Amino acid sequence: MSNALSIGKSALNAAQIGIATVGHNIANASTPGYNRQVMVQAAAQAQNFGYGYVGQGTNVVGIQRVFNETLSKQVINATATSNASNAYYSNISQVNGLLSDSTAGLNPVITSFFSAVSAAAANPSDTATRQTLISSAQSMVNRFNAVNTQLDQMRESINTQITSSVDAINSYSAQIATLNDTITKAVNSTGNMPNDLMDQRDQLVAKLSEQIKTTVIKQDDGSYNVFAGTGMPLVVGTQQYSLYTRASDTDPTRVEVAYGNAASPKILSTDTISGGTLGGVLQFRSETLDAVQNQVGQLAITLATQFNAQQTQGYDLNSVVGTDFFSVGSPTAISSAYNTDPTKTASASIVDASLLTSSDYTVKYNSGQYTITRLNDKSIMWQGTSLPATVDGMQIDVNTSTPAEGDSYLIKPTQYAAGKLALAFTNVDQLALAGSATTGPSDNENGLKLAALQNGANVRVAGSSTNRTYAQAFAQMVSAVGTKTNELSITSKADATALENATSAMQSESGVNLDEEATDLLRYQQAYQAAGKMMQIASQLFEVLLQLGQ
């Protein structure tokens, strides 16, 4: 009878554990990252009684979580890809809205300005038309300033997004390292996997992949080694490695991502960081925001510089040679923070606006010579032992005859130009519409030339062998941003669908199905009742034997 009682007890114990496991699944059906658990049973070692082997009941081998590593990796990859495209799309949509707005964009005010120039040229002696020209010019300047301000605000928003994302990455990786330690200790001490802790760790990995592309390599001791981007270690066993944010070496207003020694982490290139919100935001800044702000600045410089050049060829109402109508800021030159002598600076000036590009440039001194590189296509534009040098309509120089090895400078010809644009005067008499100092007030020779600038091939556009008009250059910029926005709209939706499908596939295997759990609950309940009945019968039989013995 003791054998029957023992078998019944093992069955009762298994049923109890099964009910507890199912109950745990039901309780966590809505818990993020929870993977359902199942009880694993095995028959107890049978005993040989001579006439054959008699079973000894059941053993509970363990509680196993249903987790598919392949599906999990698919979800992690899809999450990083989806968040990257979504972050890029949400940011570029703002730029697209800014540029394409028919009332807030640049094209209407440029058109209005040249219409006023034409009107003034048609009636050069009329003060009212001259005043209208001044007002239209001021409106155009204000619009350039406003667009640049909004782009600067987007740039500040990107800085905030980068900082927030890096903070989240460091928090998740620190928690993963802590769980690695706890899980490893639990496995070593009991030999069993702490399923709920492992779920928590996998959920943290999933959250980490929302911020950056994440790769996980499982170790023999149950710990995870986690790598980000193109292979930067974030977690190795119980050791966590942080990302940092720091100002760019050549632009203190630009937040960059750095890695390495906490005292002096090295700035990472955009190519090193991919996927997730952080990757998407950095890609948007480097591919779209920088390019658009530079192009807007290029348009402002080119229009203003060429208008000034023609204005100074004419004569005003007082028969005085015209002066610059627009105030145009000089290109910005920034010394690297790593330069040996910070007093050694670079400078740049525009010599031919029609040759100006929307790219930034670097000037580096190595092995006895300077190298000037155009950054948008990585082209080496000039090399020599001494400066100045003229590159793409711009003269570049340094203020030293004794450069140090490794000295580096960043030249930004156009990024800040739209924000610096202003009117140099507002006196209507100073508009130089006349072509000669001796002709009468009806002389409009120079006014007609100023108006003709609207349709001239004045702006250099990347990828084109011929220059474009101001309107064409702006339209091409708007079109490029619009095309990229539409592309990302489609891509982000496709990536979101891929993530949804990957998540559904994993949930169908690892998620809690309440209908299935209810069925299992009834099954274990019946097993529990049957085991109890078995023990009751065994007990009754034992009582009969005792009575027979008396």
Task: Specify the residue positions occupied by each region the protein language model found.
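S/T-rich, low-complexity, solvent-exposed segments of bacterial secretion/appendage proteins
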Residues: 1-550
